[in-house]
Amino acid sequence: MSTGWIVIGVIVILVLFAFGAYNRLVALGQRVSQAFADIDVQLKQRHDLIPNLVETVKGYASHERGTLDDVIKARNSAMSAQGPAQVGAAENQLSGALGRLIALSEAYPDLKANANFQQLAGELSDLENKIAASRRFFNNAVQEYNTGIQQMPAALFAGMFGFTRKDFFDLGASRTEVETVPNVKF
């Protein structure tokens, strides 16, 4: 009779541990989802800023149609991207196009001196800082989640409960490029 109780005790302990591991992994997964939603908010703000920036530049550099079209195409692509990997690739293209757009201000002193352009470029720089901070938080949450599903003994239950590795938010740039915030000078 006592071995029966021991077996029941071991089973109860395993079930309790499985519930604990499951709840911890769910919490880590929710943290990743929330962190990605935070990035998404910042990216949407940047997407909303772009048409105003393009219109301002268009007023001073209308013959730079190729650059303006590149920015609009990259914005549309970024807005339709889904998931960290696809969003990261689309946002990388958008960042490059925005960099070329901002660089136009060097060739057009009147544009560079325009108060609206200065305000929009300043807002863009602030958003880039917020995006970088949100990206670091997201990647930290992904690292913690991926570690959680790989550590023993939770790894025994992770696959059974359907927990899989999550992708980092990668902009396809080197670490120094990602951590270097664009500097907008007037």
Ranges and model annotations:
Residues 2-186:
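A helix-centric hydrophobic-segment signal that preferentially recognizes long
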